[in-house]
Amino acid sequence: MNDAAPLGRVVATERKPNTPHEFHFWTGLDSPVGIGTIVRVDGPVPVNGVIPRIYGTVIEGFSYTDLQSPLHDVMSADGDPGNARRAPTDRTEIRLYTAAVLRHIPEDPLQPVPMGEVHLADENDVAVALRMDGYLKEGSRTGIPIGVYRSGGTEAAIYLDADFLLGPEAAHLTITGVSGLATKTSAVEWMLSSIFTHFPASKGSVAAVCFNVKGPDLCFLDQPGEIDETDRALHARCGVPPLPFQNVQYYAPYKSDGVSINTLRSNEALQDNVAPLTWGLREVLQYAEVLLNKDDVDAKADALIDFIRERVVDREFRDELLGNRVHIVRSFAELEAWFKDVLQAVEKTNKESWRTHHVATIRKVRNRLTNISTRCAGLVTDEGNVSDLPFGNFADRTVYVVDVASLEEDAQDLIFARIVTKLREHLEKRDLGVNHVVLFVDELNKYAPGDGPDTYVRKMLLDVAERGRYLGLVLFGAQQFRSQVHRRVAGNSGTALYGRMDADELATPGYSILAPAVKTKLASLDKGQLMVRHPHFTQPIFVRFPRPAVMRGRDGAEQFPQALEVSFESAVLRTLRTLDPSLTMTWLQDAMGIQEQEDIVRARNATMRERPADVRKYFQAQLRPIVTASAGPRSSGTPVRSGPVNDPYGF
C-alpha cells in the first residue's frame, strides 16, 4: 500500500451523495489530479476484518469559492478587475472531483464509497484497479501492452488481455477518430508489433492480413521509420523493440494491361516481397453475387449460376443437345465458348429453354459472367492464371498486405469477399498454417455501414464479428465515425480505442455514457493519445502509445517513388528479375522472339507463381514453340499469256 501523504479526502453531501459506482473528493489547488487520473481510497473502518480499498478514475472536476453570486465579486472590486489584486484576503477556493469506480476490494459486500483518504495511484495500484493483476501473473501471463498511463508522476504500462483481444473469451478491436489527427493507422501498426512481441507461445501462432484501401499507408511496413527518444522510451517501457516488421508480404492485382502490378509499392528496390494477385474462373465463380446486381439477377439467374458452378466448371460436361461433345470449362474463355455452343444449339432446335432455363436467362447470365474478367481486368484473367495468398502455408508473425487502394469498388469487394472467406474456411479446418489471424480493415463505416443495402461484404464482416473469435479470426477495424458502423460489428468488438474525436460524432447517442469532461478531453487529444475500453476495465482509460518504428506512407512515397511506365519488355524483365537478378534484356528478347504478348504474359505469370530455381529454363519452357516452314525449291508459276503484237496498251 502507498504510504505517501493523502492528496485529498472523500466528501459527500445530500445533493451529491456517494454511491457504489461513483464518489466525490476534494484536493488542494496544487494537486496533480486531472481528468483520467486514477486514485485510491482507503476506507477508515474495516469491513469483515479488511480495510476496504476503492479505485476510481476522475471523470469530472469542479472549482468553488464562497461567493453566492458573481455580482458580489464585481462589487468588491468596484467594477475594476485591477482592484481585485489589492484585496486584503484571497477568497477561499476548493477543487472538487468526481470519480467513477474501477474496482472495490473486497468486492463483496458492494457498498457506497466510504469517507476515506484519497491517494494518487502508483504502478501497482494501476494494475490492481484495472484487474491486470489477474493476467500478468508469472507462468500465465497473457498481457499485450497497449501504451503507457501517465498522471501525477505515476507511469505504468497498460496491458490488454490476449484472451479478450484475440479470443476465445472475446475478440476484435475498433479504433475511431478524425482523419489525420487520431493516428488510427499508427495505432494499429503499434498493436500488431505489440501482439507479435508479447503474444504467448502457448496460445499458438499469429499472423495479420491487412487491406491497404487508401494511398500508401501500409506500403512500407518493412522499412524503418524515424522515431525520437520519447518514442524509444515508450517502446522500452512496453517491452517492444523499435523495429519495423521483419516478415511482410505484399499482394496486388496487375493493371489492366496485365503487365505492371497495380500498387504504390512499385519501386524496383522493393520488389523482392511483392507478388501479383490474380484469379481465374474457379476462384471467382463462388463469389459471383458480389459483382452481380441483385435487382437485375433474379432467382432464375441464381439457379443457372449454381448449375454452372456445380455441374459445368471443372467437370466433363456432356449434353445430348450439344451432340454429347465433352466440354471442360476451367477459364472464362472456355466458359464463353460453352455459352456460345449452348445458345447455338437452342436456336437450331427453335426451343425457348434448355434444362428448364429460359433462353433469356441464359443470355443474361452469359453477359453478367463473361464480362467479369473485363470489369476486374488485372485481377481476373480469361486464361485462369492463379497467383494467390499462401493459404495453408501462412507463417507465424508475418504481415500479409493486400493493396487495393487503386482498384475499382467491384474489384475491392471481390478481394475482400474471397480472402476473408478463404481465411475462415482454412481456420475451420485448422490448416491455414497459423492459429490466429488479425484481419485489419480500414474505413469500416464504408464496408460495414449501419444503413444501406445488405451487401455480401457487410454480411461477411458481420459473420466475422459474431463468430470469428471461436475460429481465431479477429477483426481490427478503423473508422472515422463509429456511430455509422453496423451495431453488431461495433457491439461485438471487445476492445475499443478512441483518438481525437469530432464534436459531431461525440454528440451521437453512443457517447452519452461519457461525462462531459471526458468528451472534452477526447475532442482535444494529442497525436499518440488514446482512450481505451476493454472488458477488464470498468471505465475508459487514457494512455499514450509510441510512434511505430515503421516508415510512414507519405515518407515512403517520397523515398521510394513509383516506377515510371516502361515498355512491355522492360516490365516483364523487371518482374522476372525479382527471382533472378542476373537476367538481361538481351536474353529476354531472344527468348521472346516473335511470341504473342498474351503468351509472354502467360509464361511470366506461370514463372512468378512457381518461382523455379532455374528461371531462364522454366520461362522458356512456358513459351509455345514457333514452327517455321521449311524452305523448299520454288515452283515455277504458270507463264503469263502474252498480248497481241499490235496491242496499243502493251509494254
Place the predicted regions along the sequence by residue.
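Conserved ASCE P-loop ATPase motor domains encompassing nucleic-acid-directed helicases/translocases
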Residues: 1-138
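Conserved nucleotide-binding/hydrolysis micro-motifs of P-loop NTPases
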Residues: 30, 62-64, 105-106, 214-218, ...
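P-loop NTP-binding catalytic core
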Residues: 111-172, 556
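Glycine-rich phosphate-binding loop of nucleotide-binding enzymes
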Residues: 149-249, 532
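P-loop NTPase motor domains
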Residues: 199, 203-206, 210-211, 215-221, ...
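Conserved ATP-driven motor cores of ASCE-family P-loop NTPases powering translocation/secretion/packaging/pilus
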Residues: 237, 456-457, 462-549
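Conserved P-loop NTPase motor module
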Residues: 528-598, 602, 624-651
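Charged low-complexity interaction tracts in eukaryotic proteins
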Residues: 607-632
